């Protein structure tokens, strides 16, 4: 369980967009404000994306709460995981599919470096040099990562309790690239 908690803690730091130690509506609002600008979305596209991102935050992260601390976040994930491991895996596969289907707006079913950098900036990560190195850990084919592969990598990161299995997201965090 310690291995998973370490990974969940890393994820918490990504979700804590303003880096104040707590996930709150301010983190949600930051992503809702920044994403349409970063992607250059039309007003109609922005409204749809904002609605879907807001729903994602409420469904998978805040779950009706106004804020969540890291210990609460870890406890919540541990409770879900120990209660029903298969349901937990299914939930977080859906979680990452849902968010990647929103934030990769060009509908190519692949993530380019440009997509990756823009999406990372939405989460408060602005160092493009580190983001480029992080992107390269995914070993993109012709400069692209298939969305399904990326989504599966994140689901694996959150749900896999075996430290001997390859985990590109964990490698990204361990290398200090996010």
Report each predicted region and the residues it spans:
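Helix-boundary capping/turn motifs
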Residues: 1-7, 24-27, 48-49, 91-92, ...
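EF-hand and EF-hand-like Ca2+-sensor regions
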Residues: 56-113, 117-178
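Assembly/interface modules of non-enzymatic eukaryotic complex subunits
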Residues: 26, 37, 41-60, 65
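The feature marks the first
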Residues: 1-45
């Amino acid at each position: 369980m310690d291995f998973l908690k370490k990974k969940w803690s890393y994820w918490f730091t990504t979700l804590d967009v303003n880096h104040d130690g707590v996930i709150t509506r301010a983190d949600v609002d930051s992503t809702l404000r920044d994403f349409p600008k970063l992607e250059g979305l039309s007003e109609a596209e922005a409204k749809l994306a904002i609605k879907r991102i807001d729903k994602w935050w409420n469904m998978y992260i805040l779950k009706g709460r106004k804020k969540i601390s890291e210990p609460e976040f870890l406890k919540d994930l541990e409770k879900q995981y120990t209660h029903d491991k298969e349901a937990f895996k299914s939930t977080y596969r859906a979680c990452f599919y849902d968010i990647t289907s929103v934030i990769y707006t060009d509908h190519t079913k692949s993530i380019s470096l440009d997509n990756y950098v823009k999406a990372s900036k939405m989460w408060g990560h602005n160092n493009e040099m580190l983001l480029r190195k992080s992107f390269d850990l995914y070993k993109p084919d012709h400069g692209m990562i298939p969305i399904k592969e990326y989504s599966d990598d994140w689901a694996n990161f959150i749900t896999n309790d075996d430290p001997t299995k390859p985990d590109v997201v964990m490698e990204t965090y361990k290398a200090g690239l996010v």
